[in-house]
Amino acid sequence: MATNIGMMDSAYFVGRNEILTWINDRLHLNLSRVEEAASGAVQCQMLDMTFPGVVPMHKVNFDAKNEYDMIQNYKVLQDVFNKLKITKPLEINRLVKGRPLDNLEFLQWLKRFCDSINGGIMNENYNPVERRSRNGKERSVKGSNKIPKSLQTNNNHPPPNSSSVGLSKASGPKSAKAAEVQALSKELVDLKISTDLLEKERDFYFSKLRDVEILCQTPELDDLPIVVAVKKILYATDANESALEDAQEYLNQSLGVEDDEAEGNGEQLEEEKTQA
């Protein structure tokens, strides 16, 4: 099993759209953002599909909204990791915050891991809706494929008579509608291409930042002033706009202290030579 996947592995260059399509197709969901999977329930069910019977799905809360409930899901996931001897660390405190990049990175790893089992072939007998149900009633998973009540209500209405159908078909120029649909389809394709390119570029630079972070966490470099300054920028919150200024100020102060110490040591050596 490919549990140890390096940051430069091709798995971490899989775009957001591909990840969402993978989740939605396999679990019959309709997620539109990766952060919607921050509760950990999706990850639990992905492993339930990959390793039938290993995940206690009755303990997985698909309605988790607060951090406490989400953490309980991740505890279930951690237990499953332990059973399967998966060494991937779960950064629960970061995942439950719902930050897109943190969740995207974990889902990229999960997809790579699941694809490495049985060649990524899906279990055809697996019913995702039934597995995440409680007492025969589907849980209210955000983004699940349900029929809106308005459509259900409309289905109960008697069908229109043939004369009204004929009138509706005759109304409006078909050619104009066809041209409009074609134009919108082309615009949609162009937008998708642009989005995919932007996602690849974003993921590329994210992987670079991740490499810098790993380098900064090296014990031999951890206390160097330049490394501390870089960490101040890497770990700055979104609201902190002066991260660069703070890092520069810290670096200047640290280097200033070192220069003063070096100058003091030089003067002391010069004085000792004079006395000698």
Swiss-Prot record:
Basic and acidic residues bias located where?
129-141
In terms of superkingdom, the source organism counts as: Eukaryota
Q: Name one Pfam family in it.
A: CH
Q: What spans are recorded as compositionally biased (Low complexity)? A: 162-172
**Span list, region Disordered:** 124-172, 252-276
* Localisation: Cytoplasm, Cytoskeleton, Spindle pole; Cytoplasm, Cytoskeleton, Phragmoplast
* Residue runs in coiled coils: none
Residue span, EB1 C-terminal domain: 173-243
**Tissue spec:** Highly expressed in guard cells of leaf stomata, pollen grains and pollen tubes. Expressed in young roots.
Which GO biological-process labels does this protein carry? cell division; microtubule bundle formation; thigmotropism
Q: Which GO terms describe its molecular function?
A: microtubule binding
Q: What are the UniProt keywords, alphabetically?
A: Cell cycle, Cell division, Cytoplasm, Cytoskeleton, Host-virus interaction, Microtubule, Mitosis
| Acidic residues composition-biased segments | 257-270
Question: Calponin-homology (CH) domain spans which residues?
Answer: 13-115
Phenotype seen when the gene is deleted = No visible phenotype under normal growth conditions.
Mainly resides where?
cytoplasm
* GO terms for cellular component: cortical microtubule, transverse to long axis; microtubule organizing center; phragmoplast; preprophase band; spindle microtubule; spindle pole
- The protein's assembly and partners: Homodimer and heterodimer with EB1B. Interacts with tobamovirus movement protein.
What else is on record for this protein? Plant microtubules behave differently from those of other eukaryotes in mitosis: they lack centrosomes and spindles are barrel-shaped with unfocused poles and no astral microtubules.
What does the entry note on its domains?
A: Composed of two functionally independent domains. The N-terminal domain forms a hydrophobic cleft involved in microtubule binding and the C-terminal is involved in protein binding. In Arabidopsis thaliana, EB1A and EB1B possess an acidic C-terminal tail that has autoinhibitory function, but EB1C has a tail region with patches of basic amino acid residues required for nuclear targeting.
Q: Which family does it belong to?
A: Belongs to the MAPRE family.
Q: What's this protein's function?
A: Binds to the plus end of microtubules and regulates the dynamics of the microtubule cytoskeleton. May be involved in anchoring microtubules to their nucleation sites and/or functioning as a reservoir for distribution to the growing end. In plants, microtubule minus ends are not necessarily severed from the nucleation site and transported to the plus end of a microtubule as part of the recycling process. May play a role in endomembrane organization during polarized growth of plant cells.
Name under which the protein is recorded? Microtubule-associated protein RP/EB family member 1A
Q: Which organism encodes this protein?
A: Arabidopsis thaliana (Mouse-ear cress)
Q: What gene is this protein a product of?
A: EB1A
